[in-house]
Amino acid sequence: MKQICILGSTGSIGTQALDVIEQHSDRYEVYCLTANNRYEMLAEQARKFRPAAVVIANEAHYESLKLLLADLPDIKVYAGAKAIDEIVEAHPIDMVLTAMVGFAGLSPTIHAIKARKTICLANKETLVVAGDLICRLAAEYHVNILPVDSEHSAIFQSLVGEGDNEIEKILLTASGGPFRKFTLDEMRDVKAADALRHPTWEMGAKITIDSASMMNKGFEVIEAKWLFGVEAEKIQVLVHPQSIVHSAVQFRDGGVKAQLGVPDMRLPIQYAFSFPERLPLNGDRLDLFRQPLEFFEPDMEKFRCLAMAYESIRRGGNVPCVMNAANEVVNEAFRHDRCGFLQMADIIEATMQRATFVAQPTYDDYIASDAEARRIAASML
């Protein structure tokens, strides 16, 4: 019986992970659940899955959460970022699903790696911000990082059985988001409500906006570089509106292996939990007769965030960290009508130019770079 800790259990990935665990309760148990603000939902989940502990990151909700679980004294209730860092180190935990959003996922991921827990990585910002550090730590502590993003899971699945066979190219697919066919003038006037209508995936608000700007795909290019040791020049983004081909790998003999399936995040979540085994999963099955499969080149002029992600890789150092911090600021501002859709890329680019460059950042440098970039980006709103 594997004991699982879910960081961000009330979000889109977290709730779907709990669905997987419920379907396979003979194999998986929830040891710990964490959330940022949604203490009522966290309490409901705790009542259903009976973890050993729950943690609410926002300490203002600690008393409310404790009150809601007062009749369940076996469930320990904690609060704060430090408590999350500590809980992932708990001895019974086998796997940590990092499903929390943004830079906040970095510290608990590092603590979990140092405690030699298997990492099921859904928090892509961890590798965007500090990919070099995370990969070095994973190697040092002999920890497996299993991708949960559908695209990276597809690449991972395509590499099973390939051993040391050389990757010639990674084909990273993108839906193109809701504004794929918009002109720049049309994109100038879009609002958060428009961007939150993703054509194929059900996701949280932050990642849905990142998908609309294609910053999410830029993050995934960086994530793929670190997970699979492939230079950015060998990672090609393909716009694939149907989101059926989740990604593919081309090998040096010209052969291509891809993973296909209906858009359902429970599949990559479950694969990370069960690897190398495949377990049954309730849900829709792929019907290739229902629709054609289309592929297009991304428009880097319209979707500048994707171009900036490649640029951040080229520049290296702390630049991806700076880009991520600026993006978190403008993404939130756009969702609250304090920033225009195209203005997001302007502010991110300006922040990348103005922030202090650090060629070989330490963990403390990442913390400082994140804070500096947030200040710079916020000053332009």
Model-identified regions with their sequence ranges:
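Catalytic, metal-anchored helix/loop core of enzyme active sites in primary metabolism
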Residues: M1-L381
